[in-house]
């Protein structure tokens, strides 16, 4: 579960490496974000020459969490690190590649584009 001040890794090639959650979107009582939720983040670490710069504010969709997700058949998928994909103003991915695996639950959240860019879908 991701909350304000959580540090996440960026799973795309937008140029950002680490971001910090500054707001969880989705209502006034929405305190934590789960897999597939959209959050507002600030870039804390970026590579030189990337599309984004340190201090920029973007939206991002969470693609991997340490707490994981429980499937209807009872199985659980957990990851080692929390990761997200940065989105532009039109809610499209900024990067052209997504590194690492993503889960099928993104399809129900209408992020099929991220699934098609990903290396592996679990």
UniProtKB/Swiss-Prot annotation:
This is Large ribosomal subunit protein uL14. SMART domains: Ribosomal_L14. The keyword Ribosomal protein applies. One of its GO terms (cellular component) is cytosolic large ribosomal subunit. Keywords: Ribonucleoprotein, Ribosomal protein, RNA-binding, rRNA-binding. Part of the 50S ribosomal subunit. Forms a cluster with proteins L3 and L19. In the 70S ribosome, L14 and L19 interact and together make contacts with the 16S rRNA in bridges B5 and B8. It comes from Rickettsia akari (strain Hartford). One of its GO terms (biological process) is translation. GO terms for molecular function: large ribosomal subunit rRNA binding; structural constituent of ribosome. PANTHER family: 50S/60S RIBOSOMAL PROTEIN L14/L23, LARGE RIBOSOMAL SUBUNIT PROTEIN UL14M. Binds to 23S rRNA. Forms part of two intersubunit bridges in the 70S ribosome. The keyword rRNA-binding applies.
